[in-house]
Amino acid sequence: MKEINPNDRPSSVSAGRPGSAVYPTTPLGEKFENIPTGRDVEWEPLVDFRRMDVSENTIHGAVAWAHGDEIIHSFGGNVLVYGRSMMKPLMMKPFVEVLKDLDWKQKAISCSSHNGDTEHVAAAQSLLTESEWGLMQCPLDVPLIQFGRQVRRPRRWFHTCSGEHAAILKGMRLMGMSRAGYTLPSSDWFPLYLDVLREYMNKPNWEPLRVAKDGCGFPTVSNTVNELALMFANLVARRDDD
């Protein structure tokens, strides 16, 4: 019987497109230049869960402290990671001017993750007219924490990122941007977001090594722990800018 080359196995994805080949080729995953894996960095133990003094689960990670444009201390390695939901305040920066008239509840829900509580959903929905609700592309979900009557029918508004999605859709309308495919890196707001990251890192020529899809559907870009620390130090230092 002829042995099949693993790279020639049939795939539902057309040849040449991501996912068309068998991946990964090793159980430890592929290696890519300038992208260290979890086996390549010197993680530090941050939290140790014990049962009767015996360690059962240890969480490892990396930490960096920044002041202005300077890293003053770090440990665990300058690991490459995705900022994901912690980047919400920076993702809203391209829309500061057009959304400046939002009330504080609307601003808070735009820049944060939420539990899907009644007041959270109300704040998120208030950002859009009811006729615009159908544009929402965040995943279906149920409230994160439920008491009393249980919500069992998933809805987009219950998703932890629905406020951010609604705010970006509103901002794009006010800026005259097409909202078709608004969750894709090819959308008009995304290059503006990358410019914000360059500004807050003080790295005008920076480019992300990877752009991936976050759990809510929005793009998430790779940054080192040091880069994230610098951005959030500057976010605090410039908190009164807008």
Predicted regions located by residue number:
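Short, solvent-exposed loop/edge-beta patches enriched in aromatic
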Residues: 67-69, 97-103, 132
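Alpha-helix capping and helix-loop boundary segments enriched in small/acidic/polar residues
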Residues: 78-83, 115
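Active-site SXXK
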Residues: 83-100, 119
